């Protein structure tokens, strides 16, 4: 196969996003030593607006749009995203070419004073940017106070260290990628904090017309992770199609079978619906839709319709 002479990766400029882009850069450089692989760092709208909760300003698609523009106008050949930030429906003209092997999918409890969530006194302030985490926290620990936490990973840790929060909840994978695993006091079992759709996996997006890149990027695709993430995204698409609602899903492959658990909740956690399904790994989208149907049968549509739409 003739690999291109050059490849440009579009990435957000945060430390975590650049780590992820550099990881993919290294993989590509190893696969194609003759190809020059460079990174185009970009500041996205989501990185610039830090004084409002994500749900209010348009959701996680704000982290993706500028990168897609770079793909559309030819400044970049591929974009690297955290899969949990990728909107459920890509705009026309774009495609996911590969999903990398999943890292730790769990949420991490980070605190300077407490060993785990159960040890937090009533009234403690916990920071998170995620309605998914907020609803699960409030359902399990209604005595805690959950407040919005924005900014990159280092900013969030600084706010914790300044005493603005008793604890914060972050993605374990991000902390580990940046060499900050020592900050994790507890990795929360997915049974107790169902991860975001795609959490821990990286997605590689391309201009859909660049069919030449599909073979080039194919070695980066991890079929088992891709099946799990596609099942999770299938559930989310069937229910809401947005990153910014209190839902989560986590799929695992065992042999030829996918097992998946998902939930939908009110933001305050007072209404909480959870279901599980299993089915053939070669039909991930259908499995996601089946899980969504089970949640709808329990009343998920009513909960989602009652959420504030800003």
Swiss-Prot record:
Coiled coil: none annotated. It is an enzyme of class 2 (transferase). It catalyses: 4 porphobilinogen + H2O = hydroxymethylbilane + 4 NH4(+). Its cofactor is dipyrromethane. Gene3D superfamilies: Periplasmic binding protein-like II (3.40.190.10), Porphobilinogen deaminase, C-terminal domain (3.30.160.40). GO terms for molecular function: hydroxymethylbilane synthase activity. InterPro entries: HemC (IPR000860), Porphobilin_deaminase_cofac_BS (IPR022419), Porphobilin_deaminase_N (IPR022417), Porphobilinogen_deaminase_C (IPR022418), Porphobilinogen_deaminase_C_sf (IPR036803). Pfam families: Porphobil_deam, Porphobil_deamC. Tetrapolymerization of the monopyrrole PBG into the hydroxymethylbilane pre-uroporphyrinogen in several discrete steps. Belongs to the HMBS family. The porphobilinogen subunits are added to the dipyrromethane group. Monomer. This is Porphobilinogen deaminase. It comes from Methylobacillus flagellatus (strain ATCC 51484 / DSM 6875 / VKM B-1610 / KT).
């Amino acid at each position: 196969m003739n690999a291109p002479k050059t490849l440009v990766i579009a990435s957000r400029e945060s430390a975590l996003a650049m780590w992820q882009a550099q990881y993919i850069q290294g993989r590509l450089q190893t696969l194609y030593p003759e190809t020059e692989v460079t990174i185009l760092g970009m500041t996205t709208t989501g990185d610039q607006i830090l004084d409002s909760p994500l749900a209010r300003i348009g959701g996680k698609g704000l982290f993706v749009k500028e990168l897609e523009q770079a793909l559309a106008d030819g400044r970049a050949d591929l974009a690297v995203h955290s899969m949990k930030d990728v909107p459920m429906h890509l705009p026309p003209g774009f495609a996911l070419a590969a999903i990398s092997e999943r890292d730790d999918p769990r949420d991490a409890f980070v605190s300077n004073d407490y060993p785990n969530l159960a040890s937090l006194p009533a009234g403690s302030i916990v920071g998170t940017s995620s309605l998914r985490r907020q609803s699960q926290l409030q359902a399990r620990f209604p005595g805690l106070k959950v407040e919005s936490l924005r900014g990159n990973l280092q900013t969030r840790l600084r706010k914790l260290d300044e005493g603005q929060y008793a604890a914060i909840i972050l993605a374990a994978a991000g902390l580990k990628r940046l060499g900050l695993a020592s900050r994790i006091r507890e990795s929360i079992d997915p049974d107790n904090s169902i991860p975001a759709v795609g959490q821990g996996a990286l997605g590689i997006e391309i201009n859909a017309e660049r069919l030449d890149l599909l073979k080039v990027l194919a070695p980066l695709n991890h079929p088992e992770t891709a099946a799990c993430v596609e099942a999770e995204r299938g559930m989310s698409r069937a229910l809401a199609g947005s990153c910014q609602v209190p839902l989560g899903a986590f799929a695992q492959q065992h042999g030829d079978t996918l097992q998946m658990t998902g939930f939908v909740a009110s933001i305050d956690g007072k209404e909480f619906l959870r279901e599980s399904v299993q089915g053939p790994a070669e039909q991930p989208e259908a499995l996601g839709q089946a899980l969504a149907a089970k949640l709808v049968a329990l009343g998920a549509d009513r909960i989602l319709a009652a959420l504030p739409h800003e």
